[in-house]
């Protein structure tokens, strides 16, 4: 009996050791604020940017630190701008300090830079206070903010009271105007209607960055154009479209975007004569 027990024990240990040696495919970190449920996707290599595309220019948006060499690679791959997250919604929400270096690296790589915030509507801090944190954090690093994009996606992350949500968003928009910033909203037809009940009086000066994807990765892409846009809220024309999510470009995970090629300032405009770096204000909106 003892011999049989020993053999059985050795067999179990052998199975456990074999199981431990099998490699497990670990999903990469992807921003939990992605507006779709299929964010746990292993990032695939993104298709190349089409050369000599007259109508649209390409950008990426990201929420993780990116090095100068990676952004130089991005520039060489045909991208013109990056959207950098400047506010992290975790907990009560806080300024994303990683954005400072990424913005500086993007300038040095010759890319235009836009900033977006993923606000925390459940925070004890008002919306305008969250924008204040971005303003103070970036200006302390010598970065001048010309515009900000507010992420309004993932209805489950927002309170169910649309009026309260409208007031929260409006407090950010109003504060941004006080700072002299251009304001944009990152959302979709569905998200906007669910979160704000289709709020249409946000202001005609507010730009739109909409997303439309079928899933994460290359197979989930939609056309890199505005052809699928339908009017909602106060918007009849978009400025930016996110057409792909969770793809690899230059060894880091991004979402991919397009904007009208004639609506962007030159990257050389990223620095004032006093040496301060500009963040935002590159994408001017469709005329």
Tell what function each PLM region has.
Residues 91, 122, 192, 217, ...:
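Flexible, glycine-rich phosphate/dinucleotide-binding loops
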Residues 146-228:
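Catalytic domains of cell-wall/extracellular-matrix polysaccharide-remodeling enzymes
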């Amino acid at each position: 009996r003892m011999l049989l027990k020993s053999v059985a024990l050795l067999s179990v240990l052998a199975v456990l050791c074999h199981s431990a040696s099998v490699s497990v495919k670990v999903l990469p970190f992807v921003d939990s604020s992605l507006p779709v449920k299929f964010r746990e996707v292993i990032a695939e290599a993104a298709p190349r940017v089409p050369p000599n595309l007259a109508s649209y220019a390409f950008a990426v948006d990201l929420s993780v630190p990116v090095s100068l060499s990676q952004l130089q690679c991005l520039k060489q791959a045909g991208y013109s701008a990056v959207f950098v997250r400047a506010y992290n919604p975790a907990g009560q929400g806080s300024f994303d300090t990683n954005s400072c270096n990424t913005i500086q690296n993007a300038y040095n790589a010759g890319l235009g830079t836009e900033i977006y915030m993923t606000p925390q509507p459940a925070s004890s801090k008002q919306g305008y206070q969250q924008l204040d944190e971005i303003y103070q954090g970036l200006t302390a690093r010598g970065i001048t903010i010309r515009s900000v994009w507010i992420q309004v996606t993932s209805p489950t992350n927002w309170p169910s009271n649309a009026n309260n949500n409208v007031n929260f968003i409006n407090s950010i928009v109003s504060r941004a105007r006080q700072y002299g910033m251009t304001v944009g909203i990152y959302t979709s037809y569905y998200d906007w209607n669910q979160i704000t009940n289709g709020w249409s009086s946000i202001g005609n000066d507010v730009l739109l960055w909409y997303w439309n994807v079928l899933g994460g990765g290359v197979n989930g892409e939609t056309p890199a154009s505005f052809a699928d846009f339908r009017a909602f809220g106060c918007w009849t024309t978009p400025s930016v479209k996110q057409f792909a999510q969770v793809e690899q470009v230059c060894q880091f995970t991004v979402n991919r975007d397009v904007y009208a090629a004639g609506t962007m300032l030159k990257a050389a405009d990223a620095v004032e004569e006093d040496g301060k770096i500009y963040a935002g204000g590159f994408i001017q909106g469709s005329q």
